[in-house]
């Protein structure tokens, strides 16, 4: 299928398994599609999912032409970082913070060069424990800070899901469980997690 510029906004969700699963029935991309329908915007907005399980920012950089730029997006939502952090300790496949920033910067530049708006999302959680008690919390905060800084540097929109999830869990994780409130396994979103992402991401999209 070829894509040409037209009056319809084309939003591409670019990421890892969280975005891939976001295309499922109760995933956040599907929920955003329902909001588009409910607000009578179907003729104005088209969404495309471009999430692949296991991806790091390096992988996004390598496949951006094929999976994003070739489709002429008007807005590209970049939601990546979990595997970059998680892989450092789980499998040795993650990226150190310097390489993470370099490849993330490359992704932003490529998208902007294609005249697409950009929305950056910080990675949410690896574990739902409160008070910075999850093993990767420190790294997630450091990598999220890189994304926040890049959003300011390139003057693009930020959906700070890291802060959203941490604040939610601090308030509502009464029994301090490691998973089950917003995720199925500490990482991948359950229905409530998808709803939370949808609420904040849709507001960011509309204000973009």
Question: Which residues are covered by each model-predicted region?
Answer:
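Serine-esterase "nucleophile elbow" of acetyl-processing enzymes
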Residues: 1-53, 58-59, 63-72
């Amino acid at each position: 299928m070829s894509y040409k510029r037209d009056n319809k906004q084309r939003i591409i969700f670019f990421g890892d398994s969280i975005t891939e699963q976001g295309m499922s029935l109760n995933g956040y991309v599907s929920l955003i599609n329902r909001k588009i329908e409910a607000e009578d915007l179907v003729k104005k907005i088209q969404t495309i999912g471009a999430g692949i399980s296991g991806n790091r920012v390096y992988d996004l950089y390598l496949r951006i032409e094929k999976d994003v730029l070739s489709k002429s997006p008007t807005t590209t939502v970049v939601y990546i970082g979990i595997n970059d952090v998680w892989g450092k300790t789980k499998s040795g496949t993650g990226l150190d913070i310097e390489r993470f920033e370099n490849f993330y910067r490359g992704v932003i530049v490529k998208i902007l060069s294609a005249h697409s708006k950009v929305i950056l999302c910080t990675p949410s959680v690896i574990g739902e424990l409160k008070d910075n008690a999850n093993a990767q919390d420190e790294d997630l905060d450091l990598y999220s800070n890189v994304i926040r800084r890049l959003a300011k540097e390139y003057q693009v929109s930020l959906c700070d899901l890291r802060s959203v999830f941490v604040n939610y869990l601090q308030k509502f994780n009464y029994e301090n469980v490691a998973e089950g409130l917003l995720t199925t396994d500490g990482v991948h979103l359950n229905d409530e997690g998808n709803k939370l992402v949808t609420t904040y991401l849709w507001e960011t999209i509309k204000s973009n």
